[in-house]
């Protein structure tokens, strides 16, 4: 039954259980027990389970995702407003409970250059997180990140290398 719920595999060979992009989020909410069931099934079949939590940190599923996590990767763009949102999220986690504080302190922040402005803005944002999380990594601007489905082989070599550094940072936490 689980394979029938998964997105069709593509070149990445990754299975994906995702929301329906043709429906509003309000029609696809899952609650605590549903999340726990999904996590239980996923953990039975997969050694690594990744969640793209969205940005509704007040949602029950978001809190359960945090409670089920061993590593947080906090993405942000190289701009003040998204960086402030990421910083506020980390602050809220630190205030939530001891486990959430530990997750925030050991988080990896990924700062992506969404426009071809050069690395200065990304470096300023990255500097704001250094010393507050385990690691801060930058992803250079790459037009392939803005042009439809992501494919690793369509990224520039520098972007591929940057994402490999992110993966290595995540792996070093285990």
Model-derived regions, located:
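Inter-motif core of Ras-like GTPase G domains
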Residues: 44-46, 59-80
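Conserved beta-strand segments of the P-loop GTPase G domain that flank and frequently precede/overlap
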Residues: 24-26, 50-52, 74-78, 108-113
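P-loop/Walker-type NTP enzyme "switch/lid" segment
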Residues: 1-44, 147-150
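Beta-strand-loop-alpha "switch" segments that mediate conformational coupling across diverse proteins
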Residues: 113-157
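Short acidic catalytic loops
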Residues: 47-57
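NTP-binding/hydrolysis catalytic cores, primarily Walker-type P-loop NTPases
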Residues: 147-174
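Acidic-aromatic/histidine active-site loop/patch
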Residues: 3-4, 92-98, 105, 170-174
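Short glycine-/polar-rich loops that comprise or flank the Walker A/P-loop
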Residues: 68-71, 102-107, 132-134
